[in-house]
Amino acid sequence: MRNSENVLNSLAGHSQNPNYKFERLYRLLFNENLYADAYQMMSHKTGNMTKGTDGQTISGMSVKRIQSIIAKLRDESYQPHPAKRIYIPKKNGKQRPLGIPAFEDKLVQKVVQMILESIYEGSFEKCSHGFRPHRSCHTAMASIMEGFDGTRWFIEGDIKGFFDNIDHDIMIGILSERISDERFLRLIRKFLKAGYLEQWTFHHTYNGTPQGGIISPILANIYLDKLDKYIVEYISKFNKGKARKRNPEYKRIASRKDKRVRKLKAEKDEQKRRALMEEIKFHHREMQKLPATLDMDEDFRRMRYVRYADDFLISVIGSKEDCVRIKEDIKIFLLEQLKLQLSDEKTLITNGHDVAKFLGYEVTIRNTEKTSTAKGAKGLPKRSLDHKTVVRMPMEVMRKKLLEYGAMQITVKNGKEVWESTSRPVSYTHLRAHETLSDL
């Protein structure tokens, strides 16, 4: 029996060839080592101790049970239990359905997830950050901070009811582009059609992935990788020009400053040198008040994109008309190719200097004419952080968290709230609060 690490590494190696078709995946599900590794990865997670519809938890694992599962898979008599569906509250007051699979289904899903991840992870786009190894909401926000400087417009994307509106036939069709194994694809379809339990009544599902299911994240990323690749190609056609044109006024003042710098180098008279230095400082201050390049340059456009699960944020250096067209093109692609709807009420076009929201954070572009008080090596004021990307936690969220962790207390003075820190955090809860806020 092959070592599970070798099995998965072999899959990952073959996946580097985009034309390679995987033909014998189903037989990998007969490898007991994969289940043993899956169990090790799942056993320490508290959520896996929640009872599924079969009333069992993963703590009852045994080799005999694994062999029983494999026997059912061999003759294809294995049938996933309907997922126990519970509802968790959302911020907008609505509820999000969460499916809790039965124990056996959790284990089989984990093995399937390991196989799919080995095949697809290497081909996913860099712009995708949700539910992937070594990626998180923090890497998504870091990529925004590093790559969204100078944004004129944001497009805040939201796909309506994504997890419950995945088309099963399209999902299987996408998988079949790389997987030529009918038994493996039939197993995926069984999970998709497993249905759910709502108030302990069985209902049948025709769309959607089991959101509490272990394979939901990888299936979602495989499905939305089509969107990622469409937008990456769109960006390559949209982007135009090597750099923004220089601001003529900035260029004129810079030319005057440069002339005086050249004179200063050749001037020997100390009094004239001081006068030239004052003029240089004056022109430098004037330059600090102006953008070095034109904000609107018809010959320069840029578009950038970050996705986390079904939420995405697009940065546009261009016109608002460009954004309207981009939004409409994405809406058409989602509807025609993936049978998904872009939420008009949540997909907003936001000015770069206003606040866009993504993953609970506020994203904006700094806009100030103030010059920094710090000075550079030559004693001249440094340029301020104009047009830089700013990511921050909403003030109300910060207030709530600090109070929740007991990291501050609020007093009211002269009708205004005053935030005061408590003593240095020493408890585990306080330390976790400190670490959480530091990460943000």
Question: Positions of the model-derived regions?
Answer:
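Non-catalytic terminal/accessory segments
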Residues: M1-R432, S438
